[in-house]
A protein has these predicted regions:
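A structural signal for short, well-ordered beta-strand elements
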Residues: 14, 59, 84, 171-174
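Small/polar loops that bind or transfer phosphate-bearing groups
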Residues: 24, 82-83, 139-140
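N-terminal helical cap/lid subdomain that shapes the substrate entry/recognition surface
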Residues: 1-68, 72-76
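Conserved short hydrophobic patches within well-ordered secondary structure
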Residues: 1, 49, 83, 94, ...
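Asp-based, Mg2+/Mn2+-dependent phosphohydrolase catalytic module
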Residues: 71-78, 87-189
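Short, flexible loop segments at the rims of nucleotide/cofactor-binding pockets, characterized by
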Residues: 57-61, 83, 113
Length: 189
């Protein structure tokens, strides 16, 4: 992420510090650019950022324990899905590194407002054919908690991630705790 932003600074001539960009992560990329006042250079910034992020993806290690935790949930029959603000190409590459089935994957689309709006979470629940009240959204940024609350989903803050725990949010300290949080029982087909 930082390498990709540094490439934007170098190649596009953007002076906005990485710290300012980082405070906004979790939102769709174009929303971040608008919040930073960079929407006029959006196409070029996005092109450089996305290309660099995809090229650097193999160098970014997964959070320790996440592969095992997701495999255990998958084996239990828990329906797994992803709602992210990352580009579809980067998301596809990342998910290909996991040996689990993700029943729904939601990335930013022009037709659907991104987090903190609830829509991507509602679409994910609909595609997975589960009630939002029986769903849990795990995220590491404040916009994740806002989106979950707006969607009527339980939110668990991933303490191993990037952002600070939002006030009042339940927190997981490590991926292994995903199996200990009282997730809804898998639904029969």
């Amino acid at each position: 992420m930082e390498t990709a932003w540094r490439a934007v600074q170098h190649d596009v001539g953007v002076s906005t510090p990485f710290a300012a960009y980082f405070r906004e992560i979790g939102r769709p990329f174009r929303d971040i650019l608008e919040r930073l006042g960079l929407e006029d250079q959006g196409d070029e910034i996005e092109r450089v950022y996305r290309a660099t992020a995809l090229r650097e993806a193999p160098r970014v290690p997964a959070f320790p324990g996440i592969h095992t935790a997701l495999a255990r949930l998958d084996k239990r029959g828990v329906k797994l899905g992803v709602v992210t603000s990352k580009a579809r190409s980067q998301t596809a590459w990342t998910l290909s590194q996991f040996d689990v089935e993700f029943g729904t994957v939601q990335t930013p689309e022009p037709s659907c407002p991104g987090k903190p709006a609830p829509y991507p979470l509602l679409v994910a629940a609909s595609e997975a054919r589960v009630d939002v009240r029986d769903s849990v959204f795990v995220g590491d940024m404040d916009v994740d908690g806002l989106a979950a609350r707006a969607a009527g989903m339980r939110f668990l803050h991933a303490g191993w991630g990037y952002g600070a725990r939002p006030a009042g949010a339940e927190q997981l300290r490590a991926p292994r705790e995903l199996g200990e949080v009282g997730l809804p029982a898998p639904m029969a087909a």
